[in-house]
Each structure stands twice: as structure tokens, then as C-alpha cells.
Amino acid sequence: MSITIGKLSQATAVNVETIRYYERIGLLAAPLRTSSGYRSYTAQDVARLRFIKRGRELGFSLEEIR
């Protein structure tokens, strides 16, 4: 399974800019890139982002989730 950042955003209800932020701070691993430069996410990335989102909903800080 390989999806774009837009599809990842839709699947997890997390804003695209938030996903990019999580990548910048190392909370979400930098994805592979397609030959045209698009980010390409896996099912593992979807699961990780859902975990991060759930942790935030439960009141954990990003540092605690890390």
C-alpha cells in the first residue's frame, strides 16, 4: 500500500501541514518519495499517525508520544 499525503490526511483526519510538522520534528519518519518527488506513505505510516492522533486526544504531549 502506498498513498499520498492528501490520502493520508483524509484517512487519519490529520491536516497536511500537521503531518509535515510531525515529519520535521521526527515524530513521523520521513516518507519515501516517488520519482516525481511526491511523498509516499505506507500502512505503517497510517498506523503511526493514528497512534499519534489518539495520544494527543488523550492529552499526551508530543514529547510524551515520541
Question: Across the structure, where does each feature detected by a protein language model lie?
Answer:
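Arg/Lys-rich, alpha-helical DNA-contact motif
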Residues: 2-11, 29-35, 40-66
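The DNA-contacting recognition helix of HTH DNA-binding domains
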Residues: 16-18
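Conserved, function-defining core regions and hallmark residues within catalytic/recognition domains
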Residues: 22
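Glycine-centered, phosphate/nucleic-acid-interacting loop/turn motifs that mediate DNA/RNA or nucleotide
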Residues: 26
